[in-house]
Amino acid sequence: MTMLNFTYYNPVRLIYGKGSLDEIEKQHLIPEDARIMMTYGGGSIKKNGVYEEVLKHIKPIVEFGGIEPNPSHETCIKAIKIAKENKINFLVAVGGGSIIDATKYIALGMEHTYSDDPYDICLKGGKFKVNPAQAKIGVVLTIPATGSETNCWGVISRHADKLKLPFNNESVFPTWSIVDPCFTMSLPDNQIRNGLVDSFVHCIEQYIGNYHLNPVVEAETEGVMRTIIGVSHKTLENHQDYQARITFCYAATVALNMSLLCGVTLCGGAHAVGHELTSYYGLAHGETLAITTPGVMRFNKEKNAKKLIQMGEQVFGIKNSTPEAAIEATEKWFKSIGMKTRLSEWGKGKEEFETIARKFEGNPAGAHKDIDYKGCLQILNDIY
């Protein structure tokens, strides 16, 4: 059991804290020749004052709103067309992971020349040559969860064929990301809960299925998980608790800024199955992970026994832990913050199970590559 060779690269200028938008001018974050498109979601930023605050610091040529949760290829195509028409060279995403992912996809899509369908960026799994994005990206984060503000990954859905697939490309690392916790304080509880789960599961998936030894990363991952658990009820019960919220925001950033992957491998099984639950049942990303994560943990209980025991002891403080105890503690914490952990709790049926499981034929997921058709079907029935 040894540490894998690795290269760590993260060029994002991360700017944290109250009043951080002022750093746009102080640090000259916008080039003089910038032709800016500002992207955002359903309009909540216009209700909570974030929109007006951002416009004090940037002057967009054009705005593109209406990007949905679990952003769609269909919506992004419209934005790509507008960006090209306006010769955009700088994109500012104001929102959470969905807005940031869509903005990265828009930046890559502007350079796409391989077919009429930029979704090739996802369909090819990011493994074929993609023209690098030329437009720079800035981020004003309003929802802590995905860590997309400091990585080069994204996930895009295509509704036409119920696909939800990831992509990655170093050219879409944001140039800078601003995180002012005050911009997150108007979030409803369900979005905070989903963010807590998403960030926690990012840690789990870089931890429990991993037998490559990097004790530094291991300790850091355990610390981030403990922090998320420790701050979860505080930040839910008092949205104005600045220390609790900035702690949660930073934990979510670190959970997927790629530093926890140094010298180790990524599992990704809970996310892979969760993406399908979003596509076929319409559940939010965090809602799916609260369901799939305990199921994937149970599915790999024997293979991951050592790390589950360690997680139980180091993260949950269980003396003489067992794999089962760690899994139960994880599910209990999900429930304690108000998450449903069974698909049946959402009133969903089993009618899509066969179709979902077929997606994993020849394309197994998980650290052990054992979530294939049969494995996925077993997990789906277990989490029902």
Swiss-Prot record:
Stretch forming the signal peptide: none
Record-listed E.C. numbers: 1.1.1.2
Enzyme class: oxidoreductase
InterPro entries, sorted: ADH_Fe/GldA, ADH_Fe_C, ADH_Fe_CS, BDH-like
Presence of the UniProt keyword ATP-binding in the record: no
Keywords assigned by UniProt, alphabetized: NADP, Oxidoreductase
Reaction(s) the record says it catalyses: a primary alcohol + NADP(+) = an aldehyde + NADPH + H(+)
Gene3D superfamilies: 3.40.50.1970, Dehydroquinate synthase-like - alpha domain
GO MF terms held by the record: alcohol dehydrogenase (NADP+) activity; butanol dehydrogenase (NAD+) activity; metal ion binding
Function noted in UniProt: Has NADP-dependent alcohol dehydrogenase activity.
Family from the record: Belongs to the iron-containing alcohol dehydrogenase family.
Protein name per Swiss-Prot or TrEMBL: NADP-dependent alcohol dehydrogenase 3
